Amino acid sequence: MSQEFDYIIVGAGSAGNTLATRLTEDAGVTVLLLEAGGPDYRFDFRTQMPAALAFPLQGRRYNWAYETDPEPHMDGRRMECGRGKGLGGSSLINGMCYIRGNAMDFDGWAELPGLQDWTYLDCLPYFRKAETRDIGPNDYHGGEGPVSVATPKAGNNPLFHAMVEAGVQAGYPRTEDLNGYQQEGFGPMDRSVTKNGRRSSTARGYLDQAKKRPNLTIVTHALSDRVLFDGKRAVGVTYLVGDSEERVEARARKEVIVSSGAIASPQLLQRSGVGPRALLESLDIPVVHDLPGVGENLQDHLELYLQYACTQPVSLYPSLLWWNQPAIGAEWMFKGTGIGASNQFEAGGFIRTRPEFKWPNIQYHFLPVAINYNGSNGVKEHGFQAHMGSMRSPARGRIQAKSKDPRQHPSILFNYMSTEQDWQEFRDGIRLTREIMAQPALDPYRGREISPGADVQTDEQLDKFIREHAETAFHPSCSCKMGTDDMAVVDGEGRVHGMKGLRVVDASIMPLIITGNLNATTIMIAEKISDKIRGRKPLPRSTAKYYVAGDAPVKGKPMREVKQA
């Protein structure tokens, strides 16, 4: 006998936990929240310590560890595509960079038919609703939300300040808040970390206040098999628990909400019979609704590192040495302070590489150590690096289910670097980064260029380095996009076109990828749509001012000119 709820939410990630918390604020509403992973164990430093952010990517307890098909423009590499597994979803394993995107991203969404209420000023109140910033609220930031946001503090690593100053010396603006009036420029970077130095996942921020409500049922280790339909209406789901092959059925009186992320949401729809007819028929899946955009329009951010030796012993290199780690861990565990309490991404920036870009097309994260994002290939000396990536690539990929089996990973292809714009942006980005790194502010610290290496100069040499070393920034999105065109999957409220009682609410419904990290925006989307589901009036539009570059020059004259090939 199946259980029955008002709403079934598939996926307890950044969006799913937000929705579950908001929907169950109405005491008469019952919600079933299904999560394929396990709990977010609060004593597991791998997910709770900000500085340990690389650890969850190295195993499969908290990571789906997807891989792409061979990427044709990246020497056929199968690229890593980590996604969070467990309460919190990818907010449980991400880099904790609290970046919202550029105001022009959302104004661009709102220019699309059917998305008129997605302007930046419509979205800003929901960013504020979700946030508690440690230095207090203002026109751009909240003070009472579930997501704890920490700002960089005086006394942090001197390399952060030097790298921001170098960006300004190279001719770019200085900004005091990458989520405030002006994103463009270099400045301190906020992070999703609590005042006690713990990761602020949506499991901690949202579910901690909701999980004891009698109208919320949370089932972990529950892998959703498919959505059940009565004609074109979603009426429930079947799921597997643990290693069992027995299907458990749950029924939804009102809606099934798919919040499984940009990889798994389109895969679940396809397995359930909602997607491109030819694909479904090739997998012997009965077609419930032919919807060609399901799994298409896939987008991501690609990035690479420029690494330098550090001539002063101020980098985090000693923290990589095992004999120093117990003391770091103890300070974090008992005091919530020290190196362990930060993700160490405390400075960054956004720039335009050419005048045709009307808002930034390159993002920087600065890190005071030289190491891969997943913790591999740490340079065995003092060093620092700039993560540099393009923001709005024209490349488009796709997600395709391979079978009806929910345990089989889908076919994933991003088509990285498939357009000439991609190559131009990365070549420009590397050369501009070298100019930034050559500025006087970094003279006390800058040693040799470790990667790519000073001898890598020509377009051909740079292209080879990009093909071999560029990596995902772990920002898959847009694979069930909002809109009204033939390839749109959902409307501006997340309702699946042609269906009843079925929504998708997560990063997959972004029509176009944003300029920056995705987590804060994914939470905002869920906050905004939760009001739609509950029949509440939207929050009043913000009246905050925001920067538009217009005809402003891309950059000023650098303090130090650098000759490059």
UniProtKB/Swiss-Prot annotation:
Required cofactor names: FAD
One of the protein's GO biological processes: glycine betaine biosynthetic process from choline
GO molecular function, one term: flavin adenine dinucleotide binding
Pfam families to which the protein is assigned, alphabetical: GMC_oxred_C, GMC_oxred_N
Residues the record lists as binding FAD: 6-35
Positions annotated as active site in the UniProt record: H475
Gene3D superfamilies found in the cross-reference section: FAD/NAD(P)-binding domain (3.50.50.60), Glucose Oxidase, domain 3 (3.30.560.10)
Catalytic activity: choline + A = betaine aldehyde + AH2; betaine aldehyde + NAD(+) + H2O = glycine betaine + NADH + 2 H(+)
EC number: 1.1.99.1, 1.2.1.8
Family matches, as PROSITE patterns: GMC_OXRED_1, GMC_OXRED_2
Known pathway: Amine and polyamine biosynthesis; betaine biosynthesis via choline pathway; betaine aldehyde from choline (cytochrome c reductase route): step 1/1
GO cellular component: membrane
UniProt enzyme class: oxidoreductase
Alphabetical keyword list: FAD, Flavoprotein, NAD, Oxidoreductase
Claim: Oxidoreductase is one of the keywords in the record: yes
Family (UniProt): Belongs to the GMC oxidoreductase family.
Role noted for this protein: Involved in the biosynthesis of the osmoprotectant glycine betaine. Catalyzes the oxidation of choline to betaine aldehyde and betaine aldehyde to glycine betaine at the same rate.
Official protein name in the record: Oxygen-dependent choline dehydrogenase
UniProt source species: Pseudomonas putida (strain GB-1)
